[in-house]
Regions:
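A generic structural signal for beta-strand entry/edge sites
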Residues: 51-55, 163
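Periplasmic OmpA-like peptidoglycan-binding domain that tethers envelope proteins to the cell wall
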Residues: 63-73, 98-174
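Generic, low-specificity signal for short hydrophobic/alpha-helical stretches with a mild N-terminal bias
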Residues: 18, 29, 38-40, 46, ...
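Periplasmic peptidoglycan-binding/anchoring modules of Gram-negative envelope and division proteins
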Residues: 29-46, 56, 67-97, 101, ...
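Short, aliphatic-rich beta-strand segments
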Residues: 54-63
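Extracellular/lumenal/periplasmic "stalk" regions immediately C-terminal to a signal peptide or transmembrane helix
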Residues: 1-48, 74
Length: 174
């Protein structure tokens, strides 16, 4: 006798194909750059990365007169915008002052570039923290002339080295 053919299993109904649309991911650095777009376009402020940190680098030309640690009043709206950008981001905030390698004048209230860099970081901290929801997130540091980003042998290089960095950890490191 011939065996009966096996019962045919009905196939499941066809599932419509859904095309996956790749939605671009807005990264943390993109959010910060967007929040500071006007300041970046105006010059003197950049947003980049350094190791596990996102760094808002502020040129000294926006901040201080040569050899001074008293903020220029025109930095106030920039400080407010930096605080607004960072209010939306998690984690601690470090404000780090940097100088060129030109020693402070003997008449200066600052005995070293390290002292000047710390005083400048504290001045930026005071203005930015004033605008933050949680000012306790902020710590300051000064590096003096120890972390140049350009050649101190040229005027342009020295100008680039005079800066304050506002740093936050990349969110994936928290």
């Amino acid at each position: 006798a011939v065996a009966a053919p096996p019962e045919a299993t009905p196939s499941p109904p066809a599932v419509p194909t859904v095309t996956q649309i790749d939605v671009p991911t807005i990264t943390q650095i993109d959010r910060i750059r967007a929040a500071l777009a006007n300041e970046i376009a105006g010059g003197g402020l950049t947003v980049g990365t350094k190791g596990n940190f996102i760094v808002v680098e502020i040129s000294n030309q926006l901040l201080f007169a040569p050899g001074q640690a008293e903020l220029k009043p025109e930095f106030q709206p920039i400080a407010a915008d930096i605080a607004t950008a960072l209010n939306a981001e998690p984690g601690p905030i470090w404000i780090v002052g940097h100088t060129d390698n030109v020693k402070p004048k003997k008449s200066s209230q600052f005995k070293s570039n390290f002292d000047l860099s710390v005083a400048r970081a504290k001045a930026v901290q005071a203005m930015v923290a004033n605008e933050l929801k949680d000012p306790s997130r902020v710590a300051v540091d000064g590096k003096g002339e120890d972390e140049p980003i350009a050649d101190n042998a040229t005027a342009d290089g020295r100008a680039k080295n005079r800066r304050v960095d506002v740093m936050i950890p990349k969110e994936e490191t928290l």
